[in-house]
């Protein structure tokens, strides 16, 4: 019995020694920092996944330039604001509410001459007499009238049906 008591007494002492060693290992500053880093990495990965769900990079690159620039990327993927604007395709159409006719300057004949280059050679490229100038202007006006008539006929044909096409 004395042997069993001594064995029992030795066991608690050995467990106390093990317990004392474990807290010493847990309290080392290196381990504490690594645990905090791991927990912060877990949180940051969760935040990144939630941001990716709500703000996918493919859909909103122009709305989030600061986020795109601040992320850690290889140098070829990281775009500065200058490069973002240079890489964009220029707008082919004017912004909403602004028609092309408001953007263009000049008289009707000048615009027509710009649109259809064959008129430039007919009217502006030659020295015309007054009669020839009048005749060329009459031809242009006749073309304009025919165009308007065709537009009106098309408009009436579209609206003369009981149901839309």
UniProtKB/Swiss-Prot annotation:
Q: Which UniProt keywords apply?
A: Nucleus, Transcription, Transcription regulation
Q: Where is this region: Disordered?
A: 1-101
What coarse category fits the chief subcellular location reported for this protein? nucleus
Question: Where in the cell is the protein located?
Answer: Nucleus
Function, in words? May be involved in transcriptional regulation. Modulates various viral and cellular promoters in a promoter context-dependent manner. Does not bind DNA directly.
According to its UniProt record, which protein family does this protein belong to?
Belongs to the TFS-II family. TFA subfamily.
Name of the protein this chain belongs to: Transcription elongation factor A protein-like 1
Its source organism is Mus musculus (Mouse)
The coding gene here is Tceal1
